[in-house]
Structures are given as structure tokens and as C-alpha cells.
């Protein structure tokens, strides 16, 4: 396993250096930020999503009436309202096509090309993610804080639960989180500040809302930052979704199989 990680990091470094060189020489270009991203409906959509999602997570993890039976539907509702509001609340003069492009809801250069870009981009940005993991590891060693995900305790349950959790982590979470964080929020924020600053801000917020605690923020923030880089590069949301799914799916499968 360690050998696979080392090889992946080495390949990632090679791809990252190549990408930076191509970018500096003008042979690699980032997508142009869509003007419709300035529509405040995208920011409103993210606020709706974040509020309801937080409520769903808190409700599902607490002793409130219904527990997860209430928390999970709230998560679905959060995504439904979040993805629907930009179209319903768009300002005059903004078309549905404008909103779709602002969210990254298009095929880019084609589904296959964007999917491959997501895989290549994920590997290329592994060194950046490794830096975040190193910071988190250092913080846990110094403070004794626990940066593990609560889902780990449930991966040893019945096979049906394992499959459900894996599907949630590798399908629903990447699709919903990318459309909201890198689609709506990043799509809007990068029209207000430089895209690197927008990616950093969103990365920190992305890390802070996860249940790994404060020590886990650097590692998850780097993941969020990387996904924003992919969105900025491709324009389409497909590559970030693929990279996010690859990240979550790999982690859940490895941890789950190791514990079972």
C-alpha cells in the first residue's frame, strides 16, 4: 500500500510541475469565469444549502426526535433547494443557460475528456493534499485531537449499511457538494475576488463544516481548494465531481475493507 501511495505522489508531482510549466508558458489556459456568476442567486442558493445541510447533520447526529430519519431528508432537501434556487431566483436578464454555465452544468469538451481531466487533476494535486494531511497529522500529534470521521465507526456494520455509506460518500456527497461549493459558491465568489482567494476561502469553509473537528480542517480544506482549481481549469463541474468521488470512494473503501 505504501508503495502505491509513493508512486501516486511521484506521478502527482510530475503532473503538477508539468501543469505549472504549461500554465506559465501559456500552453495551458483556465476557463473564463462566466458573467452570470455575479448573480447573487448563486450565493443565496449556497446559503440555503449550507443552512439546511448543517441542520440535517446536527439533527441526524443528535438525540432530537426522529434522528437520522429527519436528518437525511433535510440533506436531500438542502441539495434540492440549493440547486433549484439559482434558476428560480435568477435576476432579470439572466437566462437558464447562463445559470447552468455559471454552475458548471455543461459537458465542457465532452464527458469522457472531462472525466479523464478529473482523474489526472486529482493525481496532479495529490502533493497539495498531502501537505494538508501533514499539517493535520502534526496538529493531532501536538494537541491529541481526534481528526477521524465518525463514519468509520459504522463501516463495520451490516454489508447493506456499508454499501449505502459508500454510495453516499462516493456519489451523493461529491455531486451535491461540488455543485454547491465549487458550482454555486465558487462560481459566484470568483467574480468578486481573485479565483485563488475564492478557492482558499471556500476550501476553509468546506473543511470547517466536516465532522473531523478543527484538526482535520487543513486536510479537508486542501481537498476543497484542489476541487476549485479543477473547476477553474475546466469550467465544467464534471472534473471536480469525478476527483471528489475518487477521493471519497478510495478512502471509504480502504478504511471499510481494513476494518471489516
Label for each model-derived stretch:
Residues 33-57, 118-124, 201-216, 220:
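Hydrophobic alpha-helical transmembrane segments of integral membrane proteins
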Residues 1-104, 252-260:
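N-terminal, membrane-interfacial amphipathic/helix-forming hydrophobic leader that caps
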Residues 35, 40, 110, 173-174, ...:
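Residue-level recognition of hydrophobic positions within alpha-helical transmembrane segments
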Residues 44, 114, 177-178:
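Acidic-residue sensor for enzyme active/binding pockets
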Residues 9, 13, 123-130, 142-260:
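Transmembrane helix-loop-helix hairpins at the membrane interface
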Residues 56-76, 91-173, 191:
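Juxtamembrane helix-loop-helix connectors linking adjacent transmembrane helices
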